[in-house]
């Protein structure tokens, strides 16, 4: 069993000052995990980790992660404000949202965030609100079901998801964005969460890199980055998790 980072006696002492319930965060563990992640991808000089603010919209945690080199993935006006308040700016912030209010797009554009369009219709919406920025990203939904080895993933049926461009919309979307003045492009996809094996990210990367080649062939658009979204799950049993994934677990 994993040893807790805080003892029963320490918790009892803290409870004398702070009324329960409360959360205690392991700053040492957070920093060590972030450093292990960056070390694992040190071979890739362009690697950037974007922490999903929705997961823990706590400015103290965000400050810790930013000091370790993380950017922020935002999906709302409030998350953009929080990211700005801890000092993040420009492409340290990636804005990915669904059913986006106009003011959210305006703020993301004003902050210089990297805007990741979730829907084909957002191209015209953003163009009318702010104009298309020179650097833009699109969220891809290939449809179907996303399975690796039968692990109990969450949200692993893209065909039923409300997020992202379909294949044909994606090709046409990049063509339109290029015509509207965009110069640099990215692509993002979220196909499953709570993944407990080593298969998810290589499989997702394969789908996106093959799609990137097709985009280049059909539109002339060459992608500057690919964002591998989704999440490493927390195992209920160590039997269901492989060693590399366990090293990244919280």
Whereabouts are the PLM-identified features?
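Short, electropositive alpha-helical surface patch
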Residues: 195-211, 242
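Glycine-rich beta-strand-to-loop/alpha-helix junction loops that act as flexible
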Residues: 191-192, 226-233
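Flexible, glycine/proline-enriched loop segments at strand-loop-helix junctions
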Residues: 21, 110-115, 154-165, 195-202
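Single conserved hydrophobic/aromatic residue that forms the stacking wall/gate
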Residues: 239-250
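Internal alpha/beta core interface subdomains
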Residues: 182-193
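Short, well-ordered amphipathic alpha-helical segments that serve as non-catalytic structural scaffolds
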Residues: 169-175, 205-215
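A charged N-terminal "starter" segment
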Residues: 1-115, 120-134, 179, 183, ...
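Conserved anion-binding
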Residues: 123-183
């Amino acid at each position: 069993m994993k040893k807790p980072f805080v003892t029963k006696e320490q918790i009892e002492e803290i409870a004398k000052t702070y009324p329960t319930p409360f959360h205690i965060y392991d700053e040492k563990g957070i920093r060590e995990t972030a450093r292990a992640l960056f070390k694992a991808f040190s071979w890739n000089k362009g690697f950037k980790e974007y922490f999903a603010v929705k997961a823990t919209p706590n400015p103290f945690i965000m400050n810790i992660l930013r000091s370790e080199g993380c950017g922020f993935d935002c999906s709302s006006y409030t998350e953009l404000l929080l990211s700005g308040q801890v000092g993040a700016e420009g492409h340290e912030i990636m804005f990915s949202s669904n059913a986006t209010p106009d003011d959210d797009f305006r703020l993301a554009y004003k902050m210089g965030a990297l805007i990741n369009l979730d829907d084909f219709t957002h191209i015209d919406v953003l163009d009318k609100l702010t104009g298309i920025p020179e650097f833009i990203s699109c969220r891809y939904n290939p449809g179907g079901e996303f399975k690796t080895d039968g692990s109990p993933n969450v949200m692993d049926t893209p065909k039923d998801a409300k997020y992202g461009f379909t294949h044909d919309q994606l090709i046409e979307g990049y063509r339109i964005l290029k015509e509207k003045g965009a110069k640099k492009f990215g692509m993002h996809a979220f196909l499953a969460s709570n993944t407990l094996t080593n298969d998810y990210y290589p499989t997702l990367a394969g789908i996106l890199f093959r799609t990137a080649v097709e985009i280049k062939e059909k539109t002339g658009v060459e992608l500057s980055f690919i964002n591998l979204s989704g999440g490493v799950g927390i195992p209920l049993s160590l039997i269901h998790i492989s060693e590399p994934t366990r090293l990244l677990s919280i």
